[in-house]
Design a protein with these regions (language model features):
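Active-site residues of response regulator receiver
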Residues: 8, 52
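Charged docking surfaces used in two-component/phosphorelay signaling
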Residues: 15-23
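Short hydrophobic/Thr-rich beta-strand motif most characteristic of the beta2 strand and flanking loop
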Residues: 25-32, 40
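Acidic catalytic/metal-coordinating carboxylates
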Residues: 33-36, 59-63
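Receiver (REC) domain active-site loop signature in two-component systems and cognate sites
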Residues: 55
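Alpha4 helix (beta4-alpha4-beta5 surface) of REC/receiver domains from two-component response regulators
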Residues: 62, 83-101, 112
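Hydrophobic/aromatic residues positioned on beta-strands within the core alpha/beta folds
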Residues: 79-80
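C-terminal output helix
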Residues: 105-115
Length: 120
């Protein structure tokens, strides 16, 4: 069982991810924005982070920048609901995200990515 931190300002997305990941046997922690997520990760590093890109207070990109400065080996999957904004997800990859997904995304594909990243 892995511990996964979900960072997303949309409660419905967090709930869907939490339910899916818990059903797959993972422990889940949640944060509603990048600032909360970074603070949680500093207190208790997790095996994987799934973060939205566009959020209030501290965006996913800003959070990734701070995270990768402090934690070089943090595993991150970035998600974005902004249609056509490939540059945001491309930027996330440049900042250290291992995988990226556009919302809405296939939960099967996300779970496959989660399992792969946890194994590597």
């Amino acid at each position: 069982m892995a511990t996964i931190l979900i960072i997303d300002d949309e409660e419905g997305i967090r709930a869907l991810l939490r339910t899916t990941l818990e059903a797959a046997g993972h422990e889940v922690m949640e944060a509603a924005n990048g600032r909360q997520g970074l603070a949680l990760y500093r207190l208790r590093p997790t095996d994987l982070i799934i973060t939205d890109i566009l959020m209030p207070e501290l965006t996913g990109l800003d959070m990734l920048l701070d995270l990768t400065r402090e934690f070089l080996h943090a595993k991150v999957i970035a998600i974005s609901g902004v249609g056509g904004e490939n540059h945001a997800l491309d930027s996330a990859k440049l900042l250290g995200a291992r995988r990226t997904f556009h919302k809405p995304f296939s939960m099967t594909q996300l779970l496959d990515a989660v399992q792969y990243e946890l194994a590597h």
